[in-house]
């Protein structure tokens, strides 16, 4: 898996070198047409969820990290691209995948969907969360020192939970496996700012929030999204730089669908280090 990721990253960097080699002008702060970022993200997590069942009723609220032993921290590759459509309008795309797993013997009876796992059951769990934020923003303040923008976008979220247990007391299923899936674009209103300390160094911050109710893929999702971050970048050449960031994100959602009926609360926080390219 990591081999494929790094191969794709190398291909992306090769394309960037080709584009930059044909660029006609040195990019100026706030005037770049494209900015690419690729690096490592090291978040820590706090996740609770509940999966109901039509026959068994309301499921138990479960902490994935504390009760199911799913990894509390993970290192993943994170990439993004910014396209400046015009002087004040820009689009941004971010993508990363969080894939965690764990095995633990539970110390209380837990109902997850159509499964009831008794005390002493050994549960092996896998939780995947893919996040693809797509956002448009407009710079209402823009000069040689500052760029302050606001806009809106979609936080495309794909969530998958799979739990396999060594014992089950469910009266309606002999399967030991419990699953839940959710897939929906969630709206987000965002604002960001960037301050150019000098031509080679800048600092920035961003916030986002929304209270939503959306229907997609045979399900209804409603809840809240909150996000915040801070970053700094240093351009060691006209086209290439390094950066660091800190990101915080929270989503609380109630899901009513054919593949998941229940609740989901998810928080991550962590640093990011990346390489940047611009033209």
Across the structure, where does each feature detected by a protein language model lie?
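Cleavable N-terminal export/targeting peptides
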Residues: 1-33
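Short glycine/proline- and aromatic-enriched beta-strand/turn motifs that initiate or cap beta-hairpins
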Residues: 24-98, 270, 276-278
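Extracellular/periplasm-exposed beta-strand and loop segments of Gram-negative cell-envelope proteins
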Residues: 46-74, 97-130, 156-184, 212-221, ...
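Repeated loop/turn-to-beta-strand initiation elements of outer-membrane beta-barrel proteins
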Residues: 88-91, 144-146, 199-203, 239-242
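A charged, solvent-exposed segment within the mature domains of Sec-exported extracytoplasmic proteins
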Residues: 133-200
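Residues on the lipid-exposed face of transmembrane beta-strands in outer-membrane beta-barrel proteins
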Residues: 38-40, 79-83, 134-138, 152-156, ...
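Transmembrane beta-barrel architecture of outer membranes
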Residues: 76, 184-190, 202, 223-231, ...
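Transmembrane beta-strand segments that form the barrel wall of outer-membrane beta-barrel proteins
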Residues: 203-215
């Amino acid at each position: 898996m990591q081999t494929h990721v790094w191969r794709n990253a190398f291909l992306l960097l090769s394309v960037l070198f080709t584009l930059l080699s044909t660029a006609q002008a040195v990019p100026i702060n706030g005037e770049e047409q494209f900015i690419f970022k690729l690096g490592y993200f090291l978040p820590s997590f706090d996740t609770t969820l509940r999966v109901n069942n039509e026959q068994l009723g309301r499921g138990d609220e479960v902490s994935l990290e504390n009760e199911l032993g799913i990894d509390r921290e993970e290192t993943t590759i994170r990439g993004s691209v910014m396209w400046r459509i015009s002087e004040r309008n820009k689009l941004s795309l971010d993508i990363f995948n969080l894939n965690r797993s764990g095995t633990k013997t539970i110390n209380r009876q837990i109902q997850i969907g159509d499964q009831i796992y008794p005390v002493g059951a050994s549960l092996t769990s896998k939780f995947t969360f893919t996040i693809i934020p797509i956002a448009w923003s407009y710079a209402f303040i823009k000069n040689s020192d500052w760029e302050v923008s606001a806009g809106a976008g979609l936080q495309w979220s794909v969530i998958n939970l799979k739990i396999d247990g060594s014992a089950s007391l469910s009266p309606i299923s002999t399967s030991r496996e419990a699953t839940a899936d959710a897939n929906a674009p969630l709206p987000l209103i965002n604002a960001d700012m960037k301050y150019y300390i000098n031509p080679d160094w800048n600092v920035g911050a961003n916030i986002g929030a929304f209270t939503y109710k959306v229907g997609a893929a045979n399900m209804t999702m409603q809840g809240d999204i909150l996000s915040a971050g801070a970053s700094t970048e240093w351009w060691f050449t006209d086209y290439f730089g390094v950066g660091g960031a800190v990101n915080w994100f929270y989503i609380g959602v109630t899901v009513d669908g054919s593949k998941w009926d229940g609740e989901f609360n998810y928080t991550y926080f962590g640093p990011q280090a990346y390489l940047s390219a611009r033209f």
